[in-house]
Amino acid sequence: MSHHGPRLSTRSQQIVAGYASVAANFDVEKLHREQGVNIPTSGASINQCPHAAAARAAARMADDLASAARAKKSLDAKGSLAGRPVHHKAATESTKAKHTGFDYEAFYKGELAKKHQDKSYRYFNNINRLARKFPVAHTANPRDEVEVWCSNDYLGMGNNPVVLETMHRTLDKYGHGAGGTRNIAGNGAMHLGLERELRLHRKEAALVFSSCYVANDATLSTLGTKLPGCVIFSDTMNHASMIQGMRHSTPKRVIFKHNDLEDLETKLQQYPKETPKIIAFESVYSMCGSIGPVKEICDLAEQYGAITFLDEVHAVGLYGPRGAGVAEHLDYDAHLAAGSSPDPIPGSVMDRIDIITGTLGKSYGAVGGYIAGSEEFVDMIRSYAPGFIFTTSLPPATVAGARASIVYQSEYLGDRQLKQINVREVKRRLAELDIPVVPGSSHIVPVLVGDAALARAASDKLLSEHDIYVQAINYPTVARGEERLRITVTPRHTMEQMEGLIRSLNQVFEELNINRLSDWKLAGGRAGVGIPGAADDVQPIWTDEQIGLLNGTAPRSLRNAEKSVVDMRAVTIARSRFDVLLGPVYGELQPTEDFDTPAVGATFKAPLVDREVAHDITVSA
């Protein structure tokens, strides 16, 4: 401790002023230098050091607790201790213990103070989605119900009746947990069946992870570490999971401007074709709603010897004739004609993508993530990625529900079409009211606010005064000054609910004096809003023909008195996937309240699937 002597002697006035808890602490000194905190050698005040102030407050609290403990001990000495836990005395006395070194609690408090100061502190709302009333949830009070307008359960599959039926049956037969990692007791027929189902992407193999965050992180970190001299090219707006995967590996990282092909090519040109290269990007960017130039990036990858890593998290279930994502959607007619065949379509965009990652936790209403690619690639990740090897596998019921959801959506187009119709309607109404929406071709509806405090206030007002839950999105999820309300419209939102959202949002904008689109135009624009020409070329990726608007087959938005429709053909096929493990199911579904009951007497034929026997299903009274 002798090395502290000289430093303490020059800080005596600081110590007297209440700086004692951090003076001569080199870690805190370094923290001060990084944060720009300057403590003078004389005339110091406790207010100049947030860590000292926090320490003083903690010390006062400790003294109060100690005094209370002494008083309680005195009372206990006079009476019986019967009924008290054995650890009571030790727990009481532990309040007297104090750190004599680094003040950890003050450090934690200081870090949180920074989040509060820049308005990026995250508040979690208590929202409990109701299976029988989607998209309605209750708050902490079960009697207080709100409409949810920011869920990533994009299609309402979290309470689809065939999904719930499958999960209940699986739970009854196989129990709750998986029992271990995939390598030790946690690799079952349900997991293997789900990975076979992910032939949806027409790839040779797939691998399921506990989440797509883990899938992205584990895959990119493993590839980056194993590929010799690898360089990863990353879109500046890539998700945190991809960024973490790159940070956890050893290769050089090159960041290119968002969706900027010219910038990407310029940077690719700087490396020999023989250098291993990965281009990591997304198909749908969730906070702005833009869609990546998937085909054009494939062109550059082939030209410069790179492989492509495409995150389809916010696209699977929503795009393409079978819900395989944007890569499938770009060759819509070819994939529609190919049907459920797992065989690749040579030359298609999806075939040209090397690695696809997706999630089970958004459009499919479950939890988990996955990768899809060549058999050798998937086997290498399975064999080397710690994020896969050392994690308990997903519960069988969850896996079965996810598989049923994928099958249902791959066989039924109506939910995807209706979602697009509702998204178009909400965007149209917002534009009429001059409410600023970040331009994008996808289903995401990002309403620009441009201020963290205002975004939080708007979210709070919508929830407390209008029973509408829309989460504010602040830094670091989006850049400072680009704070927004991210609205997600589902096929289960009714016309009346959409009208209520628009009306309430308009009122909140008026009450909080939030910038309208016209205001952003006068200010020069921000985040693509109010910038001349920024929205000119933005067209929905779903065409009128694909939605069914041209031939009159498009589904119609629901009214409040109407119930969502379950497609019984898709139900039949989804059920058939589990005939071997769970036994065939005949008769009616047990519908949730907001689904129409299947028509009595309807008969459907299930196709041969996974070598399982086709059967007739009759829905009877």
Curated annotation (Swiss-Prot):
Its EC number is 2.3.1.37. GO terms for biological process: protoporphyrinogen IX biosynthetic process. Pyridoxal 5'-phosphate binds at residues 286, 314, 359, 391-392. Transmembrane segments: none annotated. The active site is at 362. Residues 76-95 are annotated as: Disordered. Its main location: mitochondrion. GO terms for cellular component: mitochondrial matrix. Keywords: Acyltransferase, Heme biosynthesis, Mitochondrion, Pyridoxal phosphate, Transferase, Transit peptide. One of its GO terms (molecular function) is 5-aminolevulinate synthase activity. Catalyzes the synthesis of 5-aminolevulinate (ALA) from succinyl-CoA and glycine, the first and rate-limiting step in heme biosynthesis. Homodimer. The modification N6-(pyridoxal phosphate)lysine is found at residue 362. This is 5-aminolevulinate synthase, mitochondrial. It catalyses: succinyl-CoA + glycine + H(+) = 5-aminolevulinate + CO2 + CoA. Pathway: Porphyrin-containing compound metabolism; protoporphyrin-IX biosynthesis; 5-aminolevulinate from glycine: step 1/1. Pfam families: Aminotran_1_2. The keyword Transit peptide applies. It comes from Agaricus bisporus. Substrate binds at residues 122, 234, 477. The lineage of its organism: Eukaryota, Fungi, Dikarya, Basidiomycota, Agaricomycotina. Its cofactor is pyridoxal 5'-phosphate.
